[in-house]
């Protein structure tokens, strides 16, 4: 018998965003962020001792999260943390004739993403609820998810050991945000809403934006959240949400302003903020 369990999540655990920034289907089978998440969450208990040196603790402090390095000043920690990083590029099979070029974000930048979620998750969801047409958008920070288990398989004690992957699957959802809309494009075309639209309209126009990530201008996210003239007038105020988001995306992509990394969930959220403004502008134009 299949049992449906409602698993509660710790909304304050912002580092769980590390577990879902890369989709399992987009990564080699031998790779996951589970180990990074575990080492960071257990750092205080295991590694936070200057006399206790391990390769893992050294790697975390020197490469991944300089905030953990108490041997340098606070100013140096902040400077090291904000340094630019370069994504690791790789390819996966898209279909029988082509490949997808994806980017794996540097661990330090992924942590910066997570901390940005911690500070601005409510602002993100506020700005992704504006469009009436978005197919997939962050609705709120996830606080629970449903897990389906086969009770017959767990009724008796078996020989298999409990793996970290099994434990993580029981504790954490597949996404940091709870999403509205459709999680796969084919579900849109199979939905009742789409069938009803087909009955009402005889023609459908489609615009292919599959390659837009390569050409998104990072400054445009600030223009989408406010407007271009406002941002130019207040360009010195670098602590605004849009400017911080713009800078964070640049630093994680080798300081590039032209294009954003493909494959990261953070990039999808970034692009969604821009497309929400496009949706609103189109709707306003059609209704005027």
Tell me the role of every PLM-derived stretch.
Residues 1-262:
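Conserved two-metal-ion catalytic palm core of "right-hand" nucleic acid polymerases
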Residues 233, 270-288:
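Active-site palm subdomain of RNA-directed nucleic acid polymerases
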């Amino acid at each position: 018998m299949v049992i449906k369990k409602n698993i509660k999540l710790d909304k304050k655990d912002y580092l769980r965003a590390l577990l879902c920034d890369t989709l399992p289907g987009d990564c080699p089978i031998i790779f996951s962020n589970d180990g990074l998440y575990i080492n960071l969450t257990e750092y205080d208990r295991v590694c936070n001792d200057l006399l206790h040196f391990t390769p893992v603790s050294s790697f975390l402090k020197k490469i991944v999260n300089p905030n953990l390095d108490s041997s340098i000043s606070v100013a140096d920690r902040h400077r090291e943390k904000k340094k630019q990083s370069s994504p690791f590029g790789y390819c996966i099979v898209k279909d029988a004739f082509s490949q997808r070029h994806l980017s794996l974000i540097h661990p330090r930048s992924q942590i910066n993403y997570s901390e940005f979620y911690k500070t601005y998750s409510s602002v993100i969801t506020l700005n992704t609820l504006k469009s009436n047409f978005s197919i997939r958008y962050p609705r709120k920070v996830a606080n629970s998810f449903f897990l389906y288990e086969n009770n017959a398989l767990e009724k008796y004690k078996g020989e298999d050991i409990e793996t970290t992957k099994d434990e993580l699957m029981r504790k954490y959802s597949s996404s940091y945000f709870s999403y509205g809309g459709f999680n796969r494009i084919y579900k849109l075309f199979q939905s009742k809403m789409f069938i009803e639209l087909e009955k009402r309209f005889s023609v459908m126009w489609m615009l292919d934006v599959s390659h837009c990530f390569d050409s998104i201008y990072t400054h445009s996210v600030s223009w989408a959240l406010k407007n271009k003239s406002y941002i130019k007038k207040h360009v010195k105020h670098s602590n605004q949400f849009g400017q911080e988001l713009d800078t964070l995306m640049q630093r994680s992509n080798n300081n590039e302003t032209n294009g954003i990394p493909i494959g990261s969930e953070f990039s999808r959220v970034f692009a969604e903020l821009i497309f929400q403004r496009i949706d609103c502008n189109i709707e306003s134009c059609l209704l005027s």
